[in-house]
Amino acid sequence: PGGAPCNVLALLQKMGRKTAFIGKVGNDGFGNQLKGALEETGISAEGLFMDGDVHTTLAIVQTKSDGDRDFSFYRRPGADMMLTEEQIPEELIRNSRIFHYGTLSMTDEPVRSATRKAIAAAEEAGLVLSFDPNLRPPLWNTLEEAREQIHYGLAHCHILKISDDEITWLTNEEDYGKAAAAIRAQFPQIRLLLVSLGKEGSLAYYNDMEVCVKPFLHPDTIETTGAGDTFMGSILHKVLEKGLDDLK
């Protein structure tokens, strides 16, 4: 079970960090399964709400012959979309060190406004904000709307993790170094920018450094869904350990 922010939390929890999830699922079999997964993993479900009127959102992932993935969603509406501003646990946010978010909670109201309230609470409390756009085109009315919401996310984060396809689409630049430079120039509060390259590894841009890391390939790999979230969780674990001022 996921989705992306929960996958990040699961990695952090396994690394010994204290984590909590904010979101909404349906009061149905899938929702109860997800709540149970949180509790089993050790992630706090204090910010998890159960909706008796709307079902839990489902994502179906199909692996294609070339190894790429195709996502299908049952979400019109889904319970995750129904989280409201009033349900945001501001005290929980204030007592945290990092707030991690994506754009799946920005596709529709009321969860879009709820996400913005959570971001504002995190900023007011002085947290490090971490953002992974995790673009899923089928969930958006238009890609232009997606671009607008991604720009909102970029304007508020200190750490950005973005995929190779996403950064090329967002900047219209195929050179990752130039694309990263363009984003950092427009959003100068971003301290650490990470580009995941799939089987090619990853790139990191920090201060004036560019770091290229080769992939950890395994011949028996079956499924890569969640690999980027595991990567993100590992990065946040290191940020919690060292801070953003001295990652060298």
PLM segments and residue spans:
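Short, conserved phosphate/pyrophosphate- and ester-handling motifs at nucleotide-, phospho-/glycolipid
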Residues: 12, 163, 228
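Conserved N-terminal subdomain of the carbohydrate kinase-like
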Residues: 18-103
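Short phosphate-binding/catalytic loops that engage adenosine nucleotides
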Residues: 17, 43, 127, 188
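Alpha-helix C-terminal capping segments
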Residues: 7-18, 63, 238-241
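Histidine-anchored nucleotide/phosphate-binding helix
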Residues: 4-14, 115-121
